[in-house]
């Protein structure tokens, strides 16, 4: 019992003790990313029942929606270049997310009017592509804000030691993961409440509920913008306090080194964007395969340029880690077809999906807590191997229930 209490203290309570108010702004942006799943269940049912899009089309669209995340590196470089103005990127991201949500609201509630402007399928594609662009823009800024969130001096203006600063960075990163998963738990709870008794609703009432959830989801960009405003407030508050103590006031400012423009990153990324848009827009056969191969060539070229600037002892580690993560991320998933099977064959409704989502989010949160020592004491290669094996075992149940029933011989 004593060991359990020590474990809880070291994994949970200690995080609470290490929390600082300056951590809150980036955590709010991470929380916004977590609560982005609020519309996931609505989107699944609405697309399936009303848009007449195939699971294959949605799987293909998912490929294109993932492209913005491939631009995280050049966007991170852009953040370094405009460091003092990076908060404006959060507003850009929030605007794109808000537009995506409003388009979906319009498709659900004002379908006929929207279809007079563009085809319903076109509106849906625009919405699906806008959202990840907004989230990736906000994500790179949140990553940068975590650096600034760690204080350099205490309330009296005394500098923290390097060990203390390193420990605070570790805490900040851990809390960031908690904020994202905590957001998924929160929206799962909200969905369970909103979808209570959904089967008894008339079709018109169900449509109204779907639309209202997209309106509720506008809290997502609002939370991220609030994080930026709160960050500026905390920064000015501490500056004024330090000035009141007879100091200059910039003692707690993160000294960001001026970043030189890396034209290889920006130029290569521009080529990547033009190449992707060209192939995708002109309906080239095997567009996804061409984009994949082309983007691999561009990314490998950029990595080769970046690796040359790293110390020799780090090059192999970076390349090995990149290969492992690529293989892990490249593993194909079941796509939307699995959700449709669960709806049509297993008769899952919106509330049951919400309950499953809640269970998955809570288990993920517990996994982060319980496996924290394992993750900190093992290499990324070992962690990914263990996760892959565990995922394969858990997926066996889905394979079993999806097999057609065979008549007895």
What label would you give each PLM region?
Residues 55-62, 169, 349-357:
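Juxtamembrane helix-start elements in MFS-like secondary transporters
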Residues 61-68, 356-364:
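Transmembrane alpha-helical segments of major facilitator superfamily
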Residues 399-409:
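Single conserved hydrophobic/aromatic residue that forms the stacking wall/gate
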Residues 1-21, 113-115, 119-125, 149-334:
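Intracellular loop-helix junctions on the cytosolic face of multi-pass helical membrane proteins
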Residues 137-154:
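Intracellular juxtamembrane helix-capping segments at the cytosolic ends
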Residues 5-66, 319-345:
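Helix-loop boundary and gating motifs at the non-cytosolic
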Residues 88-103, 383-397:
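Structural signature of the two symmetry-related core transmembrane helices
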Residues 71-84, 367-382:
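Helix-to-loop junctions at the C-terminal end of transmembrane segments
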């Amino acid at each position: 019992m004593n060991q359990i209490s020590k474990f809880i203290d070291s994994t949970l309570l200690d995080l609470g003790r290490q929390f600082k108010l300056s951590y809150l702004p980036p955590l709010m942006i991470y929380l916004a990313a977590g609560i982005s799943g609020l519309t996931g269940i609505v989107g699944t049912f609405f697309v399936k029942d009303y848009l007449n899009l195939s699971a294959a089309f949605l799987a293909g669209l998912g490929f294109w929606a993932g492209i913005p995340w491939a631009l995280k590196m050049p966007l991170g470089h852009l953040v370094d270049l405009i460091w003092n103005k990076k908060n404006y990127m959060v507003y850009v991201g929030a605007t794109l997310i808000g537009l995506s949500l409003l388009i979906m609201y319009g498709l659900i509630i004002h379908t006929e009017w929207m279809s007079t402007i563009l085809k319903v399928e076109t509106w849906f594609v625009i919405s699906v592509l806008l959202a990840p662009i907004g989230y990736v823009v906000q994500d790179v800024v949140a990553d940068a804000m975590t650096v600034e969130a760690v204080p350099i001096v205490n309330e009296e203006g005394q500098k923290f030691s390097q060990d203390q600063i390193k420990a605070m960075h570790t805490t900040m990163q851990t809390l960031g993961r908690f904020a994202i998963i905590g957001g998924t738990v929160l929206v799962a709870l909200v969905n369970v409440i909103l979808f209570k008794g959904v089967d008894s609703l008339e079709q018109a009432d169900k449509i109204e509920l779907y639309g209202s959830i997209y309106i509720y989801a506008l809290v997502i960009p609002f939370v991220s913008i609030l994080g930026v405003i709160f960050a500026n407030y905390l920064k000015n508050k501490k500056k004024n306090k330090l000035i009141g103590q007879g100091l200059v006031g910039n003692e707690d400012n993160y000294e960001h080194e001026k970043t030189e423009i890396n034209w290889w990153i920006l130029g290569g990324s521009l080529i990547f964007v033009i190449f992707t848009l060209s192939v995708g827009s002109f309906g080239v056969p095997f567009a996804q395969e061409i984009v994949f191969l082309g983007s691999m060539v561009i990314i490998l070229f950029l990595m080769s340029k970046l690796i040359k600037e790293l110390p020799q002892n780090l090059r192999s580690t970076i390349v090995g880690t990149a290969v492992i993560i690529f293989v892990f991320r490249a593993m194909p998933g079941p796509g939307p077809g699995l959700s449709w099977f669960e709806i049509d064959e297993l008769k899952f409704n919106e509330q049951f999906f919400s309950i499953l989502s809640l269970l998955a989010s809570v288990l993920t949160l517990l996994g982060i807590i319980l496996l924290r020592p394992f993750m900190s004491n093992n290499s990324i290669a070992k962690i990914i191997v263990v996760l892959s094996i565990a995922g394969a075992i858990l997926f066996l149940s889905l394979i079993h229930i999806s097999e057609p029933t065979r008549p007895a011989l």
